[in-house]
């Protein structure tokens, strides 16, 4: 495995360890509580991270079927325990490791397109969505970098929310 892939997985695993620690400290009620009606709960962020990682790495890079309901990731208000959220995140990570383990250094420059459902694309892009295809095309390297940055961003939010809710993280 290339140095970038190894480093990328190390970074993703570091973030997952942080999320694990947060989820171990919180009740199901805390995991699904929102600071504001428009805000996301820790549960929403975990489901969103699992969906995004699956779409970018497992499906986009790894070629598995596209299975994602992005809008539901933010509308959920419960239904998964902290343990079930951890299991979901780890299941996706295991699939990501499998997909990335098959790549060579040369594969990192291959371009991969990710399709989005039109309603998700419009929600993400706003008025700019009218003029573009609901698709993101970038190199595998780019998808990996995006996933690492995205995961770290939301991990920071999860850690902050955990502290706000009284967890130690």
Residue ranges and their predicted role:
Residues 9-13, 30-75, 116-169:
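Short, contiguous alpha-helical
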